[in-house]
Amino acid sequence: MKQSMVFSPTLREVPADAEIKSHQLLLRAGFMRQNASGIYSFLPFGLKVLHKVERIVREEMERAGAVELLMPAMQAAELWQESGRWYSYGSELMRMKDRNAREFALGATHEEVITDLVRDEVKSYKKLPLTLYQIQTKFRDEQRPRFGLLRGREFLMKDAYSFHATQESLDEVYDRLYKAYSNIFARCGLNFRAVIADSGAMGGKDTHEFMVLSDVGEDTIAYSDTSDYAANIEMAPVVATYTKSDEAEKALEKVATPDQKAIEEVSAFLNIEAEKCIKSMVFKVDEKLVVVLVRGDHEVNDVKVKNVYGASVVELASHEEVKELLNCEVGSLGPIGVTGDIEIIADHAVASIVNGCSGANEEGFHYVNVNPERDFKVSQYTDLRFIQEGDQSPDGNGTILFARGIEVGHVFKLGTRYSEAMNATFLDENGKTQPLIMGCYGIGVSRTVAAIAEQFNDENGLVWPKAVAPFHVHVIPVNMKSDAQREMGENIYNSLQEQGYEVLLDDRAERAGVKFADADLFGLPVRVTVGKKADEGIVEVKVRATGESEEVKVEELQTYIANILK
């Protein structure tokens, strides 16, 4: 492709609203442009990268036995109502009405549509297992779109769905697609980890996220320093043991703590360690209010609270709800005096506290010498806190460290969550009606493009891995007015294309500095500069990833480039 004919508008300045490198560079290099908040156009170079990621995804999905189809973006509300998610999915689901006032959703995901499709067509175990996938635009009304393609309102996603007669069949396909995902992200050149995850609004169990390691990631990964264990911090169980001291219990005492609300403030004011304080929080668990206790140096993990109750929705109670429930402000909350009809659950660590401290449910006061079970009753002790760095790894090997990650893929064993709700059944080999067993497998295709850009860049621009680069080689005749340089550049361009390489020829009448700056910004793997030594049959070859350059004879160029790109 000749650069003079390409639509690739570059920017010299960083856009003010672009916070992270991938967003900045994809805009500056002319790979995309914003249409509205969280909505982007892919320009020609960006689209080439997107298509290459799509191709890798398709190759690995088909190798894993999945078959491609395409489902509608507009989905009838009745299907979502049938599954129960019309009401539980939340405000991220974009809803609309047609001219006849019939309700629809713009697809955030396609479980309902695929289940409806398959239940009408697959009636026997003889047609199972079946794995179908699509690459389709998705829509989510994000409250705060940010980070460019990483959190948008419209994005490209590969979603696959598998249907099975047995759990063993699901396990087999799940493992196969898990490996396919690992192959996809490895082929894209990404540094990633597959981690144990929470299924969230998707439902189901046994789920893994594929996380690209990046400091700008919105998720925290807890991983072992000596084993392969890795999990989203929300899902990492705490296996610590807590020893109760033999300190004698003291008499409960209420003390004034004016203007001291946070644990750090209270512990400093009372000269008591944070680990001896009891942090009390009120959660709304499917409309039921529950008091949750953790140690003062720990944080409540709301996903674990949700899992204790098998709840659909868990959120912090509002200040007004806390006031009505306990007649106090949030900063003065405590378990003492909570009436019997309000359930108290506590993290295991709370049980070991002796002569601790808690809020007194009265503004400006706390209790000291608090002892669980003597001063208040707990209905259940369980794992309720976030794991911390330095904790023992849940697999028993090593200690936990943290890293940030960008989620680019997620695989779920849905089980019969959707098939039972939507009456999607088949006849088994005994002629009995059974619900279809399902799996679900998603990849953020456009998000993967951003994740690659986030991992592969330097101070001068993008540095694309060869598998997804829009072109393999960038040929730059420095002076287009020079017949020797121009003709050599075109000859190299043509010969490399004949060898199967994708080549970009900078045939613009621009200054050398502009051409080189754009080349660095675009980030193609190899740059061939045709300069003053063209008359001698010599060009300069530069590797974008390393910055290494070498003068090469034209007759040796194809072999040289082949060694770089092998």
Swiss-Prot record:
- Kindly indicate whether the keyword Hydrolase belongs to this entry: no
GO BP annotation list:
prolyl-tRNA aminoacylation
Q: What is this protein called?
A: Proline--tRNA ligase
Return the similarity comment.
Belongs to the class-II aminoacyl-tRNA synthetase family. ProS type 1 subfamily.
**PROSITE patterns with a match to the protein in the record:** AA_TRNA_LIGASE_II (PS50862)
Among InterPro entries, the record links this protein to:
aa-tRNA-synt_IIb (IPR002314), aa-tRNA-synth_II (IPR006195), aa-tRNA-synth_II/BPL/LPL (IPR045864), Anticodon-bd (IPR004154), Anticodon-bd_dom_sf (IPR036621), Pro-tRNA-ligase_IIa (IPR002316), Pro-tRNA-synth_IIa_bac-type (IPR004500), Pro-tRNA-Synthase_IIa_type1 (IPR023717)
Q: What is known of its domains?
A: Consists of three domains: the N-terminal catalytic domain, the editing domain and the C-terminal anticodon-binding domain.
Q: Which reaction does it catalyse?
A: tRNA(Pro) + L-proline + ATP = L-prolyl-tRNA(Pro) + AMP + diphosphate
Which species does the entry assign this protein to?
Answer: Bacillus cereus (strain AH187)
**Pfam families membership:** HGTP_anticodon, tRNA-synt_2b, tRNA_edit
Q: Where in the cell is it found?
A: Cytoplasm
Q: Name a GO molecular-function annotation.
A: aminoacyl-tRNA deacylase activity
Gene3D superfamilies for the chain? Anticodon-binding domain (3.40.50.800), Bira Bifunctional Protein, Domain 2 (3.30.930.10)
Q: Which key words tag this protein in UniProt?
A: Aminoacyl-tRNA synthetase, ATP-binding, Cytoplasm, Ligase, Nucleotide-binding, Protein biosynthesis
Entry EC number(s): 6.1.1.15
Query: Is Transmembrane helix set as a keyword in this record?
Result: no
Summarize the protein's role. Catalyzes the attachment of proline to tRNA(Pro) in a two-step reaction: proline is first activated by ATP to form Pro-AMP and then transferred to the acceptor end of tRNA(Pro). As ProRS can inadvertently accommodate and process non-cognate amino acids such as alanine and cysteine, to avoid such errors it has two additional distinct editing activities against alanine. One activity is designated as 'pretransfer' editing and involves the tRNA(Pro)-independent hydrolysis of activated Ala-AMP.
Entry GO CC:
cytosol
This protein's assembly is summarised as: Homodimer.
